[in-house]
Amino acid sequence: MADQEPTHHLNPWHTRGSREVYVNPWIRVREDHVIRADGNDGIYGVVEFQNYALGVVPVTDDGDTFLVGQWRYPLGLYSWEIPEGGGPLHSLPLDSARRELAEEAGLSAASWTDLGLFHLSNSVTNEVGQIFLAQDLIFGEPTPEGDEVLALRRLPLLEAHAMAMDGRITDGVSIIGLARAVHFLGL
């Protein structure tokens, strides 16, 4: 018999208590005392993000896109990514997407398409992300934040998509964004 989607989804976890372990302006870490899905007592560590994540796939009229290169401190490696960042939970994601595209790539766009939400590391975080497609681009100069040393690369969208599919791009926001953009555009 084929796997079937349950007709209802009940939370099998029960939270008995919670304590804050760490907090800074970007994250809050809590430890929950739980009754697990198997009925046993346990603990569960959760990282709550104070911002949402977002990514922008800018596409030119001739089918090119832009990747941003930067050093990612937590991973200890250089990463090519779509323009991405975050925004305060109380702000509009499109406003933050416009800001990130201008800061990182020096671009603005006359046409924006919401390509949907996604969850990052949903086994340990509540982080939610959103992807946008930016078209009808207007070119300017990047204005990165003080702690960002960025490189900008223009290449065909399908080449960037191939990089995401074959592992040359490993950033999750970029992989999701490039896959959704190519799908949306029917390429």
Residue ranges and their predicted role:
Residues 20-24, 73, 118-128:
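Acidic pyrophosphate-coordinating catalytic loop
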Residues 34, 58, 67, 133-134, ...:
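Conserved hydrophobic "DFG−1" position in protein kinase catalytic cores
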Residues 10-12, 47-50, 55-99:
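Conserved Nudix-box catalytic region and its N-terminal flanking loop in Nudix hydrolases
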Residues 67, 81-114, 132, 144-146, ...:
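The catalytic Nudix box helix
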Residues 2-13, 78, 89, 114, ...:
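Nudix hydrolase/Nudix homology domain
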Residues 16-55, 60-61:
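Acidic, metal-coordinating catalytic segment for phosphate/diphosphate chemistry
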Residues 64-65, 138-140:
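Short helix-loop capping/hinge motifs at secondary-structure junctions, enriched
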